[in-house]
Curated annotation (Swiss-Prot):
Name of the protein this chain belongs to: Small ribosomal subunit protein bS20
Top-level division of the source organism's lineage: Bacteria
Lineage: Bacteria, Bacillati, Bacillota, Clostridia, Thermoanaerobacterales
Xref: Gene3D superfamilies: Ribosomal protein S20
Chain positions covered by the region annotation Disordered: 72-93
Bias type Basic residues, positions: 74-84
Protein source organism: Carboxydothermus hydrogenoformans (strain ATCC BAA-161 / DSM 6008 / Z-2901)
GO cellular component: cytosol; small ribosomal subunit
């Protein structure tokens, strides 16, 4: 691991940033996975399973907001869109 920084504090900041970047990527990936699972469930699963996966996706989004990975308005927009998708599929039928 080669650090370009000169000062001790700058080297430490680089290490901290790398650690946080890895954590943020993991959280963001978990959010994307939860959303994809929900969207797949809309196509093939019954309403109860899709509703549970919607809850999990919303929970993942809320956790990401709590950790500071995504902005609260972004999460709110995504939750709204997922809920609208759910309602359009299951309320119409």
């Amino acid at each position: 691991m080669r650090l370009v920084a000169n000062t001790k504090s700058a080297k430490k900041r680089i290490l901290i940033i790398r650690k946080r970047t890895m954590r943020n990527k993991a959280i963001r990936s978990a959010v994307k996975t939860a959303i994809k699972k929900f969207e797949m469930a809309l196509k093939v699963k019954p309403a109860e399973e899709a509703r549970e996966l919607l809850r999990q996706a919303v929970r993942a989004l809320d956790k990401a907001v709590t950790k500071g990975v995504i902005h609260k308005n972004t999460a709110s927009r995504k939750k709204s869109r997922l809920t609208r998708k759910f309602n359009s599929v299951y309320k119409a039928s």
